[in-house]
């Protein structure tokens, strides 16, 4: 098994046809592992990233049979820098994983694990992993207790008790009425009544984002979302809004976003962002925002019902509510899938190989310089020396290192 490292956008662009072929064949594949979504996301993130590509042959023109996209972070702990490997889709993707042609797992996953163990990292964060259990077991088997600590991360919210490792989804039949018949009689009647409000010309209407309205509609969505979540998330909200705006804008340009807005006359009431996977025929509900001061028909139920009806009419077979087992999702005829967050750490908390990853030298230099400027000289010196352990002649580290 040959493993290549792809770490530039031009090289990633050249993978499109091969990637799509593996994606279409892989039953575990989902939108956040698609070439189209990742090509936008990788161009957005600031930390170093790479994709491991596996070939079953040493021939240069042999096709890849599997891909593992990852990103590298730099952390400071106990006056030393270490690296952490994250799935490339973090922290925007609700699902991550390994893309693999069926039948190749038993060769590919061990080869990926061996490659990872030759890298420099202290923690491997397998966050939001949506993979079959055999694939997960095969991967984790290569990080035994003798050399690594493995822990499962619980994702149940302390405030709302929502389990963010549970992901409800509705399997969609080919006919809208057949879908309604899957629901309780009360829900069925409620949805029909609410959709009549927007189907019949009147005070309520739904618009769907176009190139001319996407900025306005995203502003509506994110403004409502910010108002709701600022009390709980604090200043983090601003970072999340910037990231979500960039990701959703790129997704819209790539024809991956369905964004309906509910209006009462000229007043926007709510907007709902859903990602579209045309290859796997799935709608993935990503986020919503609504006017919390509106006291009337439930905007969320209206927009979800409208979106599900639209999905069925266009031949989609799944409506995925993504992470979180919020009670309202269960009125839409859903099943559940469980994702996992497994953390693999080195025993001593230091990078494998004792050195930082070369790709993170710019990050370590930047952070060490900031520490230096703040008067935290011991930590800064450690950072400069860690850079020189990898690049002994690094001019920036040599210049900034205090004289002995």
Residue map of PLM features:
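Short, charge-rich amphipathic alpha-helical segments embedded
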Residues: 385-404
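Active-site/acyl-donor-binding loops of N-acyltransferases
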Residues: 140-177, 318-366, 370-371, 403
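Acyl-donor binding region in acyl/amide transferases
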Residues: 73-159, 280-336
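A conserved beta-strand-loop-helix scaffold within acyl/acetyltransferase catalytic domains
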Residues: 3-85, 128-295, 399
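Short helix-capping and inter-helix turn/linker motifs at the boundaries of alpha-helical repeat units
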Residues: 238-239, 298, 358-359
